[in-house]
């Protein structure tokens, strides 16, 4: 008989396991990764943040890194150029879901092309990290919002991640276009994301993979 999730978590806390140690014990015991981290703050603090900043600064394409609760950790100048005054938001998902600048100007066709996917990401992140207060606040704020709330409640879209998605975007300096999203996860920060946006103007042929 395999041990239960709550038993393994109690053992992990008593022994003060690191997240990597807990994941290994969980895999050996149950044959799968834990559905959410042992420490609710895991993925919030990124130990390699400085290295990621150097990495994204050297990229030509729009690039940024956010943590498990979508706080912006690192970004390059092409990413900053998307925003008013060249100042990106502190939390990328809160901006995409709730900011007028995003919904009315930058994220073209927000209600149909952007909202269903990003709101489901918020829902799933809150379920996966139930003790994360920032995600709980974001989830609650989205449900209360007069535009995002109804979409959140009626959405039935199965959507886990945006990797490979192509979406319309209005670039303040370049004009209307579309982005292809390339997403990966920093190994030392489960749930964090490294995002690259490949931007193509509407009158240009999209970059081949």
Locate predicted features:
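N-terminal start-of-chain detector that recognizes signal peptides
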Residues: 34-38, 43-45, 139-141, 155, ...
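Residue-level detector of functional hotspots within protein domains
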Residues: 3, 11, 49, 58, ...
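Alpha-helix initiation/capping motif
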Residues: 3, 39-42, 46-50, 91, ...
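Low-complexity, glycine/alanine/valine/leucine- and proline-rich hydrophobic stretches
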Residues: 154-209
């Amino acid at each position: 008989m395999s041990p239960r999730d709550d038993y393994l978590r109690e053992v992990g806390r008593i022994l003060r396991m690191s997240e990597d140690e807990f994941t290994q014990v969980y895999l050996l015991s149950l044959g799968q990764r834990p559905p959410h981290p042992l420490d609710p703050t895991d993925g919030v603090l990124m130990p390699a943040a400085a290295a990621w900043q150097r990495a994204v600064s050297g990229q030509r394409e729009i690039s940024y890194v956010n943590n498990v609760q979508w706080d912006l950790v690192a970004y390059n100048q092409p990413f900053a150029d998307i925003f008013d005054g060249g100042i990106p938001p502190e939390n990328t998902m809160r901006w995409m879901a709730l900011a007028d600048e995003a919904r009315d100007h930058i994220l073209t066709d927000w209600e149909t092309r952007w909202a269903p996917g990003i709101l489901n990401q918020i829902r799933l992140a809150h379920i996966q990290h139930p003790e994360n207060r920032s995600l709980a606040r974001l989830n609650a704020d989205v449900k209360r919002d007069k535009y995002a709330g109804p979409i959140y409640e009626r959405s039935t879209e199965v959507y886990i991640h945006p990797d490979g998605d192509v979406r319309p975007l209005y670039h303040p300096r370049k004009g209307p276009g579309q982005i292809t999203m390339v997403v990966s996860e920093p190994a030392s920060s489960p749930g964090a994301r490294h995002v690259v946006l490949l931007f193509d103007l509407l009158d240009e042929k999209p970059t081949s993979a």
